[in-house]
């Protein structure tokens, strides 16, 4: 990301084109998420919502992907752990599977990653129901792939019937 941006632009990863300003924008977005988490954990803020670009859930630990240069969500979750939170839950509520977040925490039993997304859309082959984590993190990944065309009701049902019980069990 840094090298491609410093060169004035180009490819920084799979479907991750950048220009001269991209690296700085991505660092500011990731930093905003990290600071928001620190603010909430310290009690300085009751809550935080980070409306940042570029997005992050496709960026993998060692590569940019699909317009995502750094994984803002994964960075925020790691900051929460560094600030002393024993358990962190990440919910991906999107048409796309957040493969980068899943990859970042696949072996971490202290981060529950739940993704509600359209089955088979992007990235191809990612976010299947059989992907549940590995090693010590086995069972810490929960994918809820919905059929194409699923509307609000399907997402809400998945949330109430799958996400809420998983969150309660993880506590």
Predicted regions span which residues?
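HDAC/HDAC-like amidohydrolase catalytic core signature
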Residues: 1-171
